[in-house]
């Protein structure tokens, strides 16, 4: 999971049990230095836990962006700046098969799979941006252009605060973790 300020690497088995994980505070930059750190941390976890590399089935990379149908293209990114050829950039550092996933869809799907949800489920992600996912029968509903769960950009206050997306009154402009901590002197747990 790559965010504006953190890199998280989680190794799971096919039953979705967490085998190992790490989280680093490191601002995202589409640079050689950043991707060297990503590769180093990825290699640490894999080599420690999977002696037989052929047992690693693949890598999912969660990003706070809109992902194309092929899971290899980024169609819209404002939370973190990414170039359109980012898949090629990643492939210089990650040599196992990998695909991109929207961060909220990825988290929502994991919750859906781990839970005993058989009907429609909505997942809301509150972090440095607001995200969300709709699932039905443990499958993501992407909607038009894979924006089905983009709760953060629903207008809650017409003509309200300007959002980073360029529109006004979006939920994201009012309810991100960063905004909410302004009410509690930086301590989100107090909110």
What are these regions (language model features)?
Residues 16, 77-79, 182:
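Glycine-rich, phosphate-binding/catalytic loops in enzymes
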Residues 6, 67, 130:
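Glycine-rich nucleotide phosphate-binding loop and flanking beta-alpha elements
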Residues 22-122:
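Glycine-rich phosphate-binding loop and adjoining helix at the ATP-binding site
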Residues 1, 58-64, 123-129, 133:
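Short beta-strand segments
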Residues 1-32, 70:
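HTH-adjacent hinge/linker in prokaryotic transcriptional regulators
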Residues 21-23, 30-31, 89, 97-191:
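Glycine/GP-enriched mid-protein hinge/lid loop-to-helix segment characteristic of carbohydrate kinases
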Residues 18, 73-74, 140-141:
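Hydrophobic "anchor" residues
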Residues 11, 66-67, 134, 155:
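Hydrophobic beta-strand positions
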């Amino acid at each position: 999971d790559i965010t504006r300020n953190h890199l998280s690497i989680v190794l799971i088995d096919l039953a979705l049990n967490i085998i190992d994980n790490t989280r680093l505070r490191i601002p995202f930059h589409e640079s050689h230095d950043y991707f060297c750190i990503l590769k180093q941390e990825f290699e640490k976890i894999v080599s420690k836990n999977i002696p037989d590399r052929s047992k690693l089935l693949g890598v999912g990379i969660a990003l706070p962006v809109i992902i194309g149908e092929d899971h290899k293209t980024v169609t819209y990114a404002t939370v973190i700046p990414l170039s359109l050829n980012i898949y090629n950039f990643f492939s210089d550092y990650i040599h196992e098969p990998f695909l991109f996933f929207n961060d909220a869809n990825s988290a929502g799907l994991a919750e859906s799979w781990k839970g005993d949800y058989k009907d429609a489920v909505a997942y809301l992600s509150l972090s440095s941006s607001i995200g969300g996912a709709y699932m039905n029968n443990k499958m993501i509903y992407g909607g038009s252009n894979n924006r089905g769960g983009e709760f953060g950009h629903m207008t809650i206050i017409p003509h309200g605060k300007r959002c980073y997306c360029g529109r006004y009154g979006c939920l994201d402009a009012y309810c991100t973790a960063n905004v909410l901590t302004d009410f509690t002197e930086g301590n989100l747990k107090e909110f």
